[in-house]
């Protein structure tokens, strides 16, 4: 090849890359311009340990060796982000066959070893956050992979959520119950979970179902977080009374911990162009100061007093990476990213055996938080303001 033809090829390649950047949503274009990640070793490591050949995702950290609708739905999202079609299909098929997902009922939330030693559904109640992630993964798989059968399944599941897990809650408007059963706390009183409502998912659902409750629910989600976090720290659970507003859940817990850490995660991965991103982050600004003061996210907050307790595990540090990036906390971002990276390298070099004894710091839940938080920071996926996801493989295509 002559120097002239080599130069011409490079110019053509650069022009093609620039054209692709211009076709991508803003955040995705920025990620592409900075260089797409070549692979996703954290997903591959998780899949080797936790995703069985039949699509069952196992949490080895509990005696039940359970699989949950959360694990299955999160796994489908990560498989989509990794362009892992075979695992996506297997995870969905296992979920349909064993949890009931995609049938005429919502999926059971817990499957595993039952009393007596047999395996099967332990709790048939559903978990609405997982139901949303199932629907979202299916809708986006249909769009990105051009597979209309996933669109049909996603819309069917979304309709079931509307029918069984959404309630009109006075001035709060339509709101998502954590599940169909067990969350009515009295007349016009409900127990809610602020971490169940990622804004990008609600935006995407509003796009495919504009007559549905999703746009109003996004406004309600902002109220849920801001009005239930008086000290700027989100609770795991909160009571909403249609006559009195939000009240601490003194019966269950006033703490913000393993559920609530996802509130900061979702606020961080929300596109800056979403009009609710700014108010949401402003309401939770004390978390940024707490991370700087304690060298990382505390494990727990008393959300009434604001008092912290303990140091969060590595998954918490990974979960707040998008939050720290979005809020411009450069020093804390660098420190927490280094912590996650160092712990990951140490853990992966040890090549621990699969199972509860070998999970170590990167057990099921810490791994899930790491895939979401560190994966986002790596550029493995981005949401735009309409809730559509752009995975890294799309900008490499």
Predicted regions span which residues?
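Low-complexity, Ser/Thr/Pro/Gly-enriched N-terminal "stalk/linker" regions
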Residues: 22, 32-70, 80-115, 119-121, ...
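N-terminal secretory signal peptides and thylakoid transit peptides that target proteins
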Residues: 1-19
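Extended ligand-binding clefts on enzyme/binding-domain cores
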Residues: 34-41, 65-69, 104, 108, ...
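Aromatic-rich carbohydrate-recognition surfaces in CAZymes
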Residues: 68, 72, 121-143
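Active-site-adjacent structural elements in enzyme catalytic domains
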Residues: 90-97, 139, 152-162
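Short glycine/serine- and small hydrophobic-enriched flexible loop segments
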Residues: 76-81, 133-143, 200-204, 265-269, ...
